[in-house]
From Swiss-Prot:
Residues 19-82 form the LCN-type CS-alpha/beta domain. It comes from Rhopalurus junceus (Caribbean blue scorpion). GO terms for biological process: defense response. The lineage of its organism: Eukaryota, Metazoa, Ecdysozoa, Arthropoda, Chelicerata. SMART domains: Knot1. Its main location: secreted. It comes from the Eukaryota. CDD domains: neurotoxins_LC_scorpion. Belongs to the long (4 C-C) scorpion toxin superfamily. Sodium channel inhibitor family. Beta subfamily. This is Putative beta-neurotoxin RjAa10f. One of its GO terms (molecular function) is sodium channel inhibitor activity.
Amino acid sequence: MKILIFIIASFMLIGVWCKEGYPMGRDGCKIPCALNHKFCKTECQAKWKGSDGYCYSTGMSCYCTNLPENAEVWDPNNNKCVG
């Protein structure tokens, strides 16, 4: 039973440290890319050191991983994109 609680607690901690999402430009829109992973990685690391990023081919937008909890990312429910 103790091991089960430990595993559940570990997954909860991993979720806290592994925020992901689309970074936003100044206009509140997702940052577009054309399958250029290096560009997206640079964009993600410029905003949040230690993060990683890639070009998400389905949405043609940069996607960042390993973000800090306070990182502001694009939210489809609260879309502020004016472009």
